[in-house]
Swiss-Prot record:
Functional description taken from the UniProt entry: Catalyzes a salvage reaction resulting in the formation of AMP, that is energically less costly than de novo synthesis.
Pathway as given in its UniProt record: Purine metabolism; AMP biosynthesis via salvage pathway; AMP from adenine: step 1/1
Assembly information from the UniProt record: Homodimer.
Organism (species): Borreliella burgdorferi (strain ZS7)
Compartments, as annotated in UniProt: Cytoplasm
GO molecular function, one term: AMP binding
Record protein name field: Adenine phosphoribosyltransferase
Cited NCBIfam families: PRK02304.1-5 (NF002636)
GO biological process: adenine salvage; AMP salvage; purine ribonucleoside salvage
Chief location: cytoplasm
Length: 176
């Protein structure tokens, strides 16, 4: 996927010391304030994945939803939600993950993933790779196969891609 850092960088807010001291937070919600930029992002992801064999899109709470939901509509594919612990009402698979700034647990409904389905996994940012790695494990435990992973932003210096080396990983914006 072509690197679009220069273009999208002007629309991404950077907030120092959030959510804790020493962390630089990349806020993609500012992209939503520019419909033409948001539309461009969705169209670029669509043009890259439209011809790949994908059966469903799985999204990581919550900013992954901002990319995955409009993309699933455009591609006419089911949308599988990966949520934080305790947010899903039916029986779930659960997995612990490590963040850039702590630990957490994510879940997916056991019956939302079809056996052997090819899944495009989406999140807004790739930092340590902990959330995405746990999400991929979760989806595979549910019977799916993670075919591709897409992140709008990749923090290359943290090297999260290394923890995802068994997956195809793509990003539009890369910060060093």
């Amino acid at each position: 996927m072509k690197n679009k850092t220069e273009y999208y960088d002007q629309f991404i807010s950077k907030i120092p010391n959030f959510p804790k001291k020493g962390v630089l937070f990349y806020d993609i919600t500012s992209v939503l304030l520019k419909p033409e930029v948001y539309s461009s992002l969705i169209n670029e992801v669509y043009s890259f994945y439209n011809f790949k064999k994908i059966d469903c899109i799985a999204v990581v709470e919550s900013r992954g939803y901002l990319i995955g939901a409009p993309l699933s509509l455009k591609m006419q594919l089911p949308l599988v939600l990966i949520r934080k612990e305790g947010k899903l009402p039916r029986e779930v698979f659960s997995e612990e993950y490590e963040l850039e700034y702590g630990f957490g647990r994510i879940e997916v409904h056991k019956d939302d993933v079809r056996m052997y389905s090819n899944i495009l996994l989406i999140d807004d940012i790739l930092a340590t790779g902990g959330t995405l790695k746990s999400s991929a494990i979760l989806l595979e435990r549910a019977g799916g196969k993670v075919k591709d992973i897409f992140c709008f932003i990749e923090l290359c210096a943290i090297n999260g891609r290394q923890s995802l080396e068994s997956y195809e990983v793509n990003s539009l914006v890369r910060y060093n």
